[in-house]
Amino acid sequence: VCFSENVAVLLDRYRIKLVALLNNLLNKAMIEVMESALQKAAGEGMDEFIQVFTDKYKEVIGGELTADTMPLLTGEQHSLLAYQIFRDEIMFGGFCQLIQNGYGGYIFDNPFAKVMRLWGAEEFSKLVYKAKKIYDANRKDLEKERTDDEFMAMYEQYEAFDDLEEAYLDM
């Protein structure tokens, strides 16, 4: 009787975990966006269209990428969010800003470049891989805390990113 009670308790625990896992997976798949928002954004451009999705993803994760919020999105959702973060950071401050804002690992330590290639953005994927080489070789220095002056000096120190940023803007 004691053994069967223990087995029943274990099964209940695993059933609860399984239900929680399935619920989590279903919730991931059920992120919804308003059709009217998509239609409006489609008329404004591709960046705005993507933004409709990524804004919803940010809402789901509470605006923060943490170990606790990462599982709330699928790999595809993370890839689209990573693209939007990449685009915004490069457009407003380049690779140095992207890395200093804490997104280096999110972009370069995950299969982001591979997914971009699989989605058909082959030249963009190559660009991300080239930036990853610079990032990997200089990660410790690129990620260290800096004053505003030290941050601005990074743009001279890491001119290797300049050509990649220009290539991205030309895509």
Positions of the model-derived regions?
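Extended, alpha-helix-rich binding/interface surfaces that flank or overlap catalytic cores
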Residues: 27-92, 96, 100-108, 115-171
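N-terminal amphipathic/basic-hydrophobic helices that include classical n-h-c signal peptides
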Residues: 1-29
